[in-house]
Structure formats: structure tokens, C-alpha cells
Amino acid sequence: MADAAIHGHEHDRRGFFTRWFMSTNHKDIGVLYLFTGGLVGLISVAFTVYMRMELMAPGVQFMCAEHLESGLVKGFFQSLWPSAVENCTPNGHLWNVMITGHGILMMFFVVIPALFGGFGNYFMPLHIGAPDMAFPRMNNLSYWLYVAGTSLAVASLFAPGGNGQLGSGIGWVLYPPLSTSESGYSTDLAIFAVHLSGASSILGAINMITTFLNMRAPGMTMHKVPLFAWSIFVTAWLILLALPVLAGAITMLLTDRNFGTTFFQPSGGGDPVLYQHILWFFGHPEVYIIVLPAFGIVSHVIATFAKKPIFGYLPMVYAMVAIGVLGFVVWAHHMYTAGLSLTQQSYFMMATMVIAVPTGIKIFSWIATMWGGSIELKTPMLWALGFLFLFTVGGVTGIVLSQASVDRYYHDTYYVVAHFHYVMSLGAVFGIFAGIYFWIGKMSGRQYPEWAGKLHFWMMFVGANLTFFPQHFLGRQGMPRRYIDYPEAFATWNFVSSLGAFLSFASFLFFLGVIFYTLTRGARVTANNYWNEHADTLEWTLTSPPPEHTFEQLPKREDWERAPAH
């Protein structure tokens, strides 16, 4: 530990290329995941804004088939201007490409890489006192597989797809028979992109599990490990068990498309509903793969700024384990309308509602941690509180949707869109921002301006709720999702929702400016622990930024004994 502090500001002798392209250092690879996830997130959020521009008013104003006749570049700029053509023929394929691209990029290439690959790689070894990951070279391979997958996903947007146009327009879930009949190789590229992303995540999961089990500091038992490290450990098991199932499903899809098999084609004895079962067996654990690392971050942020140890450490740990286990036995609640028997529907209803119990343990433990604490509303705490509100709203609407009889009405409406965005998108994204503001001083050695972080939070919080809360009303009115146009009866709430999306996008651009300012001109961090004594995990004993080789001597018990387990 002492050696680590002494060498904290030694000159890094690695060149730029060696450090960022060939690195086996867990901290550098974590930064790369965060940086790449941010870039892909910018693309995906731009798709969102384009879709909300189109949905701002009834009728099709932007996505017109006539723009295709102007060529790619000119047509693109025309599509941003509603009066560019007099008579607009709706370009439904472009709309489907936007939906597919947004879903695939966000699910596989933004949120999981940022939370699991970024924060997990950087801080899990620090929290358990490990010098690095168990398999550093595999860590490097994992990142570059992710980059390769990202490249294929973006390339699929410009490859020949259905209707003689560019891009794959089959939705991120890749449901047959649409995905098996879509022409062009854009869909194949998207499938390969998901394959590479899955391979990257599986390698990362093996690495995380091995590191967690074998490289904890001397004397640090499983029940002494910080909650963020536990969240990464549970997430790694979910990835290891769920992603190979997805890989099997999309491989079968690939052979149906290209090699004449009929796994999912009724004409050859196959069954499209089989694909739904296999996909959602992965798809529901995916929700917790996304949100569990955010749980870990929020636990540390709340404990730090409530200035109290986390309430109920062991229940918090086993609630995460229970959520992970239960996540594998509820998949068919996505399929109530796909012909399940009454008995099957009853089981999946009950199992889905049971997940509310461990989730409730976590919510009330966070509230109990704050109760009676000396709360300091710094920027990371605001994001953590925002996470609590948004995740709770998403959880409550999840209880509504778990009822098969109610889901008959809400299935594939904007009520479902609002529900899963509150849980996954807003919950996970607010967790990411909480982590960035909590740790950016530790990672970069420079601190953000507090006023800017708070302004970013309020812009995003208002924008996010303005975007997605009205979609509950649209769903209750019966507006189906994934449509390019809608009747005039839905115009008001769509207009409000679009305004919220624009505000959220503006907040994201402002955030990029805050990060640029912080990294170039932010106040230098001189203290190892720049928050308070309740930030008591091992990274706060290190310099800011931590040295290249973190623990040249393994931490002793007194270095970590004030961990949240106590």
C-alpha cells in the first residue's frame, strides 16, 4: 500500500499506442470501455432524437421515401428538414432501422459495456485489493471483441437490407419470421455483431468470477467484500449462464437465413415461438445484467453521502443473488399473448411478482441507510436519488404488467416502452452518471465543477420524466409501439414526450462538455479521499489517479476493515 502511494505520480513510460491499444491494465481497459460506450451512446441517442422528431406530430414529416432519390448524403440532410419534399411517402423501413439500431446498440454496446466492462474492470479489482484481473490478456481480447462487434453493428446500418434499402429493420429482438425473410446481409451483420458482443461479455464474465473468487485481499472473506464487487460478481454469473443461450438462438436464426434449416419456420416443421422462449430466457436476465452493477454503484454513493454504513449489508448481498436466480425463471411474462396455457400464465405471474421481494429489500435498505443520516446532496447523490425514484416507478409498472389479464391490453403499447425505459434505460443510465461523478476525480485526478454536475442532473431528470411518463398515458389510451405514424388523438402526449427527449439530448451534450472541461481544466485532486471518511473502500486509500501498478504490496486487513460489511 505504501509503495502504491509513493509511486502514484511516477511518469508512465508507456507510449500512447502501447497504453491504449495493447494494454492489459484493468484500469486502462475500464476507461476504454467507458469511452467507447459513450461514443456508441451518442449514436444511439441521436437515433432516439430522430424518432422523437418524427413522432412530434401526426403524419410523416421527416422519414420520406422521396429522400432516397437524392442520394445518401443529400437525402440525409433533406430528411432533417420537414418541408424538403411536398408529398411525403412514409419510409417505414427507415423507421424500423432506427428502432433496430437504437435497441441493439443500447442493449449490447452501451449500457453493459459501460457498467460491467467500464466500472467493473476499473473498480472491482480495486475494491477487493487485487493487483489486476486474473487474466489480463483475455481482458484486452474482451475489449477488442467488443469494438469489433460495435463496428459490425454500425456497418449493418449501411449494408443492403430489406425492400432494397440500407439497414436491418427487424427490431432488436430479431423475431422470426420477419428476421428469416428479410433480404440483404444487413441482418447477418447485426447477428454477427451480437455474437461478438456476447463473446466479449462471456470472456469478461469468466475473468470477473475468477478474479473475485481467487484474488481478494488476505483475510477478506466473501461477506466482507464491498457491494459493488458483489454486484459485478452476480452479474458475471448471469452473463455466463444467459448469453450462450442467446448465442444458440441467433446461430439457429443464421442457419435458417443462409443454410436452409427450418428451426423457426413452420413450413419445415419449425416454430417461431421456440425462438421467443430461447430469446427471453436470455432477455429477462439481461435486465438484471444491466441494472445490478448500477445497484452496486448506488449503494456506495448513498452510504458515502448519507454518511452512514449501508443498512443491512448481508440482506443486500443475498437480495442481489435472489434477483439473479429469480431472473432465470420468469422469462415468459414477455409472452403472455403468444399462446401460453392458463397454468403457465399463472406460474409466470406468481414468479414475476416474487422478484419484487428482493428488489424491495434493496429499495428499503437504501432508504434506511439515508434515514437519520447527515445527507449531503452532492452531484453523485442526486443521481443516486434519481435512480431510486425512476427504478421504483419502473418496478411498480412492472407489477402491473406482470398480470397476464392486464397485459392483454398493455402488450406492445407505449405503456411497456415507458416501463422498461424507466427500469433499464433511466435506471441504468442514472447509475452510470452516479458512478462517473462519484469516481471521475479518482480516475482522472481532476474534479468536475459541482454546479455543472447538478445542472446536468436536473436537465436529465426533468427531460427523462417528461419523455417517458406521458408514454404511460399513451399506452393506456391504446397507442401501439414501433409505429411511424399515429392518429391525432395521441398528438398531445407525443408532443410532450418529444420535448422531453430534446431536453434529455441537450443534457447529454452538456455532459460531454462537462467531461471535456473536467479532463482538461478541472480542479486537480490532491487528497486520496476527496469525499468523506464514509467513502471507505480501498480505492480511496490510493492516489488520484491510481498508479499504473495498483497494489505492489497486497492490502492488509486494517486497510479495508471499515468496508461496508461493518
Swiss-Prot record:
It is an enzyme of class 7 (translocase). Signal peptide: none annotated. Its cofactor is Cu(2+); heme. Cu cation binds at residues 284, 288, 333-334. The gene is ctaD. It comes from the Bacteria. This is Cytochrome c oxidase subunit 1. Belongs to the heme-copper respiratory oxidase family. There is a cross-link at residues 284-288 (1'-histidyl-3'-tyrosine (His-Tyr)). Its EC number is 7.1.1.9. Heme a3 binds at residue 419. InterPro entries: Cyt_c_oxase-like_su1_dom (IPR023616), Cyt_c_oxase-like_su1_sf (IPR036927), Cyt_C_Oxase_1 (IPR000883), Cyt_c_Oxase_su1_BS (IPR023615), Cyt_c_oxase_su1_dom (IPR033944), Cyt_c_oxidase_su1_bac (IPR014241). Keywords: Cell membrane, Copper, Electron transport, Heme, Hydrogen ion transport, Ion transport, Iron, Membrane, Metal-binding, Respiratory chain, Translocase, Transmembrane, Transmembrane helix, Transport. Cytochrome c oxidase is the component of the respiratory chain that catalyzes the reduction of oxygen to water. Subunits 1-3 form the functional core of the enzyme complex. Co I is the catalytic subunit of the enzyme. Electrons originating in cytochrome c are transferred via the copper A center of subunit 2 and heme a of subunit 1 to the bimetallic center formed by heme a3 and copper B. This cytochrome c oxidase shows proton pump activity across the membrane in addition to the electron transfer. The chain crosses the membrane at residues 29-49, 97-117, 141-161, 189-209, 227-247, 278-298, 310-330, 348-368, 381-401, 420-440, 455-475, 499-519. Coiled coil: none annotated. It catalyses: 4 Fe(II)-[cytochrome c] + O2 + 8 H(+)(in) = 4 Fe(III)-[cytochrome c] + 2 H2O + 4 H(+)(out). GO terms for molecular function: cytochrome-c oxidase activity; heme binding; metal ion binding. Residues 549-566 have a biased composition (Basic and acidic residues). The keyword Kinase does not apply. Pathway: Energy metabolism; oxidative phosphorylation. Pfam families: COX1. Residues 543-566 are annotated as: Disordered. Binds 1 copper B ion per subunit. The keyword Transport applies. It is a multi-pass membrane protein. It is found in: Cell membrane.
